[in-house]
């Protein structure tokens, strides 16, 4: 992250008004300045690192609560204000280039300051290129042209690992939507028309979602698109190395499962941890 964001050696303590301090308060002031600078750098990643953000905020409030009132000079750089606009309008498009609507950027995370005030760190302004924006790319799958091709299974891969690798590589979230996105046809039929499942009336498609700094969000979306298009591209079975690779991985996973029975099942895949498991279809 440090290679992408340059804060020009910013030190919040430079704006502090001159006053007499004890050595202890000087140390505290320097520490709170460092904490606030870290909070500034973490800003674009608060959505993906919520625990780090929360712990950092807790430490800021713990330290400021221990300092005397004259030690709040660093908080003079904090002021109560409305969230600032994040970036240009977000894009949602399909592979043919037709726009399907816009997404609003997320407001910056607000933190609680002394005396219960909602405050926002106002140090050196962040570069506009560091603002996170959310964008969605839709890929329609040619199910009419290839009715017998298992697009869903191909994208998911063994234990969902193929999809997890795409997400881990690109930093994007990938969702399977539309008719056939739910494994159980009877369950899918029951869910049709219910709130949140309107997509089941549409053709099978993929949504790629990126919530990243504006200077890299389009690059990551294109990267995910290229990987997925290659992954689900129907090819002759004699040249289908992806299928052979997935079958080989599945055999290894099953072999490892048998070796570890009756205890907890393991996996040779680095993407098989419980922390990475989540449903990809449905709502």
Swiss-Prot record:
The keyword Metal-binding does not apply. Residues 256-283 are annotated as: Disordered. It comes from the Eukaryota. Keywords: Acetylation, Nucleus, Phosphoprotein, RNA-binding. Residues 256-275 have a biased composition (Polar residues). It holds the Pfam family KH-I_KHDC4-BBP. Residues 140-207 form the KH domain. InterPro entries: BBP-like, KH_1_KHDC4/BBP-like, KH_dom, KH_dom_type_1_sf, STAR_dimer. GO terms for cellular component: nucleus. The modification N-acetylserine is found at residue 2. PROSITE patterns: KH_TYPE_1. This is KH domain-containing protein At3g08620. One of its GO terms (molecular function) is RNA binding. The modification Phosphoserine is found at residues 261, 269. It is found in: Nucleus. Gene3D superfamilies: K Homology domain, type 1.
